[in-house]
Amino acid sequence: MKTSLLFYRTSKNANKEASVLSYELLEKAGYLFKTSKGIYSYTPLFQRVILKMTEIIREELNAIGGQEVCLPLLQSAELWQKTGRWEAFLSEKLLYVLKDRENKEMCLAPTHEEVVSEFVSQWLTGRKQLPVHLYQIGTKFRDEIRPRFGLMRAKEFLMEDSYTFSDSPEQMEEQYAKLRLAYQRIFDRLNLKYVIVTADGGKIGKGKSEEFHVLCSLGEDTICVSGSYGANIEAAQAIPPSYTYSSELLPMKEVATPNVRTIEDLETFFNTPRQQIIKTLVVKVHKKGSEQFFAICIRGDRQVNLTKVSSFLQADDCELASDEEIIKHLHVEKGFIGPLHCPVPCYADETTRPMTNFICANNQKDIHCRYVNWERDIPLPIFGDFLLAESGDLCPQNNEAPYEIFQGVEVAHIFNLGTRYTECFSVGFQDENGEKQLCWMGTYGIGVGRTLAACIEQLADSKGIVWPLAVAPFSITILYNGGDTEGEAVASQFYQSLNTAGFEPLLDDRNERLGFKLKDSDLLGIPYKLIIGKSFQKTGMLEIESRSGEKYNISPENLLDWCSKNLPCHTRKIPPIRE
């Protein structure tokens, strides 16, 4: 490809609206064009990157028996209502909803579990067809409340989604392991630093679930890592630093605490460490279209994990109750809520189980109780794991070694769904006894745009994008000083040679200074530069420089040999461009 024919432009100035590096560089380098809030057009440059990324995905999924399909973007509400997810997604206002001419409700697909389950239920003829792995690479839609970070959180985005159907839990686990390994190979080919972490299934399902996170400072997700084990902070089990409590139980006392509302206030007022105080939060739980309120107790030095609370209570969602809701349902102001005489169901985190002689509110304004003890003063609550993990907590899955905390961008998510969806759509087969058995389902997805944005966040430098060689739009840029007719002729000769061999060169044939072209090549993130400059004129040797700064002096006759050892060959993968 010649730069003069490439429909693109670069910019010297960053977009003031770009809040993250990946978005800034994609626009600055001519890869992305914003058409509306959270909606982007991919330029010819970026489409080449997309094609290479999706080719890697196809190669790895086809290698494990995946079969590509194309499922509809427009889906009926009726399908979603079968699984109960229509109401759940509507409550979060994430669906793009519309009606057809027959006044039937439809949505633009955020995911395809319902559609693929309906499809397989109609086409599965017997057990011999199992396991089956179907996948697609296509557009998804989410009406994000706050679309931001460019491709990280867009309203329209490109995803690969896979669906497996198996005849047993064991076969489902085998498929899960295959997809997990295939996803690892995909990210390994991008040379990214990533971790696989235990995760919460969210609204898709409550079965086994893991996320792939690319590590970078921008990451929206907090990742807890201990040795080879990792977990999203939403799902991380943790053992906090221990605290020694007295075995001598003291008589409970009521203490007037005017305007003493926070843990900090209590710590100062009683001159007592936070580990001796119980903090109680009120949560509002959404479950099957109704709202319920619960009190959650935790040790005063720790925070409640709302995702764990939601999972424990088998809720669709949960959030902290507002000040107004607390007064309405508990008849007391925030800051004076506690497990004593609590008017709503009360649960307690495991951190509170060993506590003795603790301080807590008793649901009266300006009153707290001291030297409170379980069983004697308060019936034992139902205990659960509601703890938000922190750096330094011990990891129960790794011989109680401490956690380190990192930021990550979620680029893929894999789930075992069991029979949740197959039961709704009667996806099954007849066993040897003639009885109907349900299929066991898995669902898996890679955010294509998010992965490429994460590449930039992790690998970019002060000069611009640094694409992994596997997905770079061009492998090597051929550069010469504009106006140098001899350099232009030599560059054109090498361009023809490399192009014929399938090494995807980009010939910068603009009438610009060599320094300008070098900066543009670095901004674009092209892995290598072939420079036809003063060195070639003096010595006849070609200078090749990698994006990371390594330099190679190559004789012209050895150029193809060097390229064959260092550059990928794409003779048939990317469609040819008219020259």
Curated annotation (Swiss-Prot):
This is Proline--tRNA ligase. Keywords: Aminoacyl-tRNA synthetase, ATP-binding, Cytoplasm, Ligase, Nucleotide-binding, Protein biosynthesis. It is an enzyme of class 6 (ligase). Belongs to the class-II aminoacyl-tRNA synthetase family. ProS type 1 subfamily. Signal peptide: none annotated. It comes from Chlamydia muridarum (strain MoPn / Nigg). Pfam families: HGTP_anticodon, tRNA-synt_2b, tRNA_edit. Gene3D superfamilies: Anticodon-binding domain, Bira Bifunctional Protein, Domain 2, YbaK/aminoacyl-tRNA synthetase-associated domain. Homodimer. Consists of three domains: the N-terminal catalytic domain, the editing domain and the C-terminal anticodon-binding domain. It is found in: Cytoplasm. InterPro entries: aa-tRNA-synt_IIb, aa-tRNA-synth_II, aa-tRNA-synth_II/BPL/LPL, Anticodon-bd, Anticodon-bd_dom_sf, Pro-tRNA-ligase_IIa, Pro-tRNA-synth_IIa_bac-type, Pro-tRNA-Synthase_IIa_type1.
